[in-house]
Regions:
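Bacterial N-terminal signal peptides
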Residues: 14-25
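Mature N-terminal segment immediately following signal peptide/propeptide cleavage
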Residues: 52-62, 68, 72-75
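Bacterial N-terminal signal peptides that target proteins for export
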Residues: 2-15
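Rhodanese-like catalytic fold shared by cysteine-dependent sulfurtransferases
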Residues: 6, 23-52, 79-116, 123-180, ...
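Short, charged low-complexity linear motifs
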Residues: 63-64, 141
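Short loop/turn hinge sites at secondary-structure boundaries
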Residues: 64-65, 176
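Alpha-helical protein-protein interaction elements
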Residues: 14-15, 70, 103, 147
């Protein structure tokens, strides 16, 4: 059997002591610098215009209603889905998408240059908020521009719901025949009148609806739009549905009467129901 040489053996206690001291010193450092969870981190990009904020910071800002959160996407994108509380500062639809003069000029006209504000758009790969932040600094002297660069995709991925406005609801209703519309009103109101092919899901029913067929269990990416007589109730139900991994869920910012009175869609048309049923029906197979 091989044995450790005497000369080497002398260093084993010394090495063990050094290692022990290393861990003793390191432990307080680790305690002081804990690894942040996903809600408390950002992309950590270096040398970019505007300081990044985390999702947790954005939640706090939205709750306090300050600083303003500015969504710099196109109006239709915003209407279909946006972070609740965000304000749309749209681009000039006729301009080069890389030209952000319209958006930066609009922001400069609304807010003082020393005011903090948050820019957001379509997530980590969206360069729009960076370009607007740079234009605000270079052209208008803004000094406190923040960016939620994680944007709408990560906001949703972390289980947060989003808001759909009337134009966005109509766009989804008229074009997306796989979308599921959830009526969060009382069952008696739902039975009396509702959107064609809607399902009734009440507060605290998301667990049951996830498995009983009311929600598309096997298609978590399907759009799920919740409406009610009170947008706040729709938001509560939509938030609960989002927590069941329906990352493309949202709530309607108006009420059922707004949907009934809309000229952009016929909410009682069952044409979309038949198309949706056909798309979700499995083809029949011969027994041969």
């Amino acid at each position: 059997m091989n044995s450790i040489p005497k000369q080497s053996a002398r260093y084993v206690p010394i090495f063990a002591a050094v290692l022990a001291i290393f861990f003793i010193v390191l432990s307080p450092v680790q305690a002081q610098c804990p690894i942040p969870d996903i809600a408390h981190t950002s992309l950590l990009e270096a040398n970019q215009p505007g300081m990044e904020i985390t999702t947790a910071q954005l939640v706090d800002f939205l709750a306090q209603r300050t600083p303003p959160v500015l969504d710099v996407r196109f109006p239709q994108e915003y209407a279909i889905s946006h972070i609740p509380g965000a304000i749309n500062i749209p681009p000039d639809s006729t301009a080069d998408p890389n030209n952000v003069q319209h958006e930066s000029g609009e922001i400069a006209a609304r807010y003082p240059a020393d005011a903090p504000l948050v820019l957001t758009c379509n997530g980590p790969s969206c360069g729009k908020s960076k370009r607007v932040a740079k234009a605000l600094h270079d052209n208008y002297g803004f000094t406190n521009v923040l960016r939620y660069q994680l944007g709408l995709p990560v906001w949703r991925a972390l289980g947060n719901t989003v808001q759909t406005d009337l134009d966005g609801f109509a766009y989804i209703f008229n074009r997306d025949f796989t979308a599921v519309f959830v009526d969060a009103r009382a069952p008696e109101a739902f039975r009396a009148d509702t959107v064609a092919c809607a399902v009734n899901v009440q507060k605290d029913e998301a667990d049951a609806a996830n498995t009983d067929g009311r929600l598309p269990l096997l298609d978590k990416g399907a759009r799920v739009v919740v409406f009610a007589d009170n947008p706040q109730m729709a938001k509560i139900v939509a938030a609960q549905i989002a927590k069941k991994a329906y990352w493309s869920s949202s709530y309607f910012s108006g009420n059922f009467e707004d949907l009934e009175n809309s000229r952009e869609m016929r909410i009682h048309s069952e044409r979309r129901c038949h198309v949706s049923e056909a798309q979700h029906t499995e083809p029949e197979h011969d027994d041969d």
